[in-house]
């Protein structure tokens, strides 16, 4: 299939979803938000004030970059390996900064075992404790899944021994926790995990203040597409909205909505929001506006990094190009699944800044810092 025909088919799919999404109150974008013939910027403006910080240039593989702030310092972790993605030598490393611009590291945070490699599962900050969630995944066969563990620190230097996250019945979580669990105003924490067999994704929640125990699988009926790697946000009407990558190659985001604080969710439905079949992120700004960050190319290309905004949490009618092909450096070294582009963004609001962490070409750990007052 040539590129032009592919874009036409994706555009038809996007437009066909627009009316249905509007009627059913699912997230969507105006049909003219992106200019498909513009393969450089998608017709989007840049964002003044957005600046890039390179945390680490890796000689091998780096991905799943996550940033947080704790105790007056910034912490950034990612998975690292010598050459390829998800190999037995994959470990989690982190770097530390006092100003968010200059970083020390990387420092080993978690090492692989004889039978598992380890990837980041997210930061959880509660009071004077910072917790790093670590996903230990079967090295010989990823379809056998993994398990979520954690380590904690009170000073940013000394870490506890690994302990398993636990389900409500006390069992260890035999699942891979997605990297940006959301704490709701009432104290509940909502996220998603990929459970055995294979990568079966399911929303999860806990009322444990520390978010270390009490995890429960939410009710999540089967729906459209092949959902993976979601992120969630709280809409102004207090509905929880979870956006998913569609591994079935629809090249649009999937969505599920919860009206009971994450206990039950609607079946996944295709949106008209274009995607690159990649991990993305979503969240809520301090003024209540919802946002998502991803690669809305309608193809496998991840060479455009876009931030989209919505006042009501459903119509994303404003978008900015944070980085595009012109900003993309060449890949330095070959490696399995080292996709060119802006990979796996995750975002968090720290103070008056939206921090977007990602991997460039799955080689470099990079941050984009966006002043909230510029949005």
Each language-model region and where it sits:
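Bacterial N-terminal signal peptides that target proteins for export
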Residues: 1-7
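Bacterial N-terminal signal peptides
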Residues: 8-16
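Beta-rich carbohydrate-recognition and catalytic domains
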Residues: 19-60, 68-116, 124-178, 182-277, ...
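Charged, often glycine-rich, active-site loop that binds/positions anionic groups
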Residues: 121
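Short glycine-rich, acidic/polar surface loops and turns
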Residues: 279, 343-345
């Amino acid at each position: 299939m040539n590129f032009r025909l592919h874009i036409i088919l994706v555009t038809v799919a996007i437009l066909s979803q627009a009316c249905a999404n509007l009627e059913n109150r699912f997230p969507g974008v105006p049909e003219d938000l992106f200019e498909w013939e513009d393969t450089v910027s998608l017709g989007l403006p840049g964002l003044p004030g957005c600046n890039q910080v390179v945390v680490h240039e890796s000689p091998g593989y780096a991905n799943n970059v996550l940033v947080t702030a704790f105790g007056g310092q910034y912490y950034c972790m990612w998975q690292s390996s010598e050459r390829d993605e998800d190999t037995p030598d994959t470990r989690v490393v982190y770097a530390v900064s006092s100003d968010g611009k200059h970083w020390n590291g990387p420092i080993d945070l978690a090492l692989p075992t004889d039978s598992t490699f380890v990837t980041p599962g997210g930061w959880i900050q509660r009071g004077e404790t910072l917790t790093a969630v670590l996903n230990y995944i079967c090295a010989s066969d990823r379809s056998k899944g993994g398990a979520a563990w954690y380590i904690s620190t009170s000073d940013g230097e000394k870490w506890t021994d690994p302990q398993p996250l636990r389900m409500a019945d006390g069992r260890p979580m035999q699942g891979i926790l997605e990297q940006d669990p959301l704490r709701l105003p009432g104290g509940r924490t909502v996220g998603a995990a990929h459970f055995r067999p294979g990568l079966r994704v399911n929303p999860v929640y806990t009322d444990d203040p520390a978010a270390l125990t009490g995890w429960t699988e939410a009710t999540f009926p089967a729906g459209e597409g092949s959902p993976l790697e979601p992120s969630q946000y709280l809409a102004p009407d207090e509905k929880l909205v979870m956006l998913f990558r569609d591994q079935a190659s629809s090249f649009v985001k999937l969505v599920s909505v919860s009206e009971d604080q994450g206990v039950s969710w609607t079946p996944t439905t295709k949106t008209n929001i274009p995607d690159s079949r990649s991990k993305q992120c979503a969240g809520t700004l301090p003024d209540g506006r919802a946002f998502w960050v991803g690669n809305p190319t309608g193809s496998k290309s991840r060479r455009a990094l876009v931030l989209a905004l919505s006042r009501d949490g459903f119509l994303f009618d404003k978008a900015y190009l944070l980085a595009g092909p012109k900003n993309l450096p060449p890949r330095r070294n070959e490696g399995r699944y080292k996709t060119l582009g802006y990979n796996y963004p995750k975002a968090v609001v720290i103070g008056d800044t939206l921090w977007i962490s990602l991997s460039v070409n799955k080689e470099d750990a990079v941050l984009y810092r966006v002043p909230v007052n510029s949005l």
